[in-house]
């Protein structure tokens, strides 16, 4: 399903793996493996508009002009800590991508993001920049991360997540209407604690085995 600003990847493999990730009986090892696998599938959609060029190669039969990615034009930015799980799968496909990290945590009282770390690649103005975080809940952390990246020069941005809430999508649309969102599912709502419902719990805790 594709709407303005939002693409929900409803491929059967994506939805099957997401169901396994939602199941509370899935182990930490299983959750981690599924996150890597689903990130490989989501990478296909979020990188759809990567810039291409052509090079001349020799096949076993003849010379030809063949399409290839244009240089090192991709930057991946993980919102720590759970974003790392989504990033790993994309790096398997595009190992030359530049990588950055933004550390944000959500204040449990205000639900507002608090930044504690930032290290991003140079020349973001020349790269497609994909921000990865499994959950787009309130949208506050995502908006803060994109604010930081735009201040650092990023202009061609995408946001990739596993689950999104209607509230988070609307928050992103209001703050950054130029940033497309790619997700595996648009869930029903947020609860009173700012968690996505039905959701899958805390993605970071389930990936790292912490509480």
Curated annotation (Swiss-Prot):
The keyword tRNA-binding does not apply. Binds 1 Mg(2+) ion per subunit. The magnesium is bound as Mg-PRPP. One of its GO terms (molecular function) is uracil phosphoribosyltransferase activity. The keyword GTP-binding applies. SUPFAM superfamilies: PRTase-like (SSF53271). Pathway: Pyrimidine metabolism; UMP biosynthesis via salvage pathway; UMP from uracil: step 1/1. Pfam families: UPRTase. Its EC number is 2.4.2.9. Uracil binds at residues 196, 201-203. 5-phospho-alpha-D-ribose 1-diphosphate binds at residues 81, 106, 133-141, 202. Coiled coil: none annotated. Keywords: Allosteric enzyme, Glycosyltransferase, GTP-binding, Magnesium, Nucleotide-binding, Transferase. InterPro entries: PRibTrfase_dom, PRTase-like, Upp_B, UPRTase/APRTase, Ura_phspho_trans. GO terms for biological process: UMP salvage; uracil salvage. Its cofactor is Mg(2+). Allosterically activated by GTP. NCBIfam families: PRK00129.1, upp. Belongs to the UPRTase family. Catalyzes the conversion of uracil and 5-phospho-alpha-D-ribose 1-diphosphate (PRPP) to UMP and diphosphate. This is Uracil phosphoribosyltransferase.
């Amino acid at each position: 399903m594709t709407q303005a600003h939002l693409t929900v990847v409803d491929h059967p493999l994506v939805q099957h793996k997401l169901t396994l990730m939602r199941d509370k009986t899935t182990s930490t090892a299983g959750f981690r493996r599924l996150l890597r696998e689903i990130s490989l599938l989501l990478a296909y959609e979020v990188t759809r508009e990567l810039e291409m060029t052509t090079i001349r190669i020799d096949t076993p039969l003849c010379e030809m002009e063949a399409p290839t990615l244009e240089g090192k034009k991709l930057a991946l930015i993980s919102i720590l800590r759970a974003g790392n799980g989504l990033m790993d799968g994309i790096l398997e496909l595009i190992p030359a991508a530049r990588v950055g990290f933004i550390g944000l945590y959500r204040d449990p009282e205000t639900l507002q993001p608090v930044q504690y770390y930032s290290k991003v690649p140079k020349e973001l103005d020349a790269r497609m920049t994909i921000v990865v975080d499994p959950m787009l809940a309130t949208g506050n952390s995502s908006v803060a991360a994109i604010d930081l990246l735009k201040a650092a020069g990023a202009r061609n941005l995408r946001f990739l997540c596993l689950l999104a809430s209607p509230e988070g999508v609307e928050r992103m649309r209001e703050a950054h209407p130029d940033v497309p969102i790619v997700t595996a599912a648009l869930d029903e709502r947020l609860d009173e604690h700012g968690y996505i419902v039905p959701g899958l719990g805390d993605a970071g805790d389930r990936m790292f085995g912490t509480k």
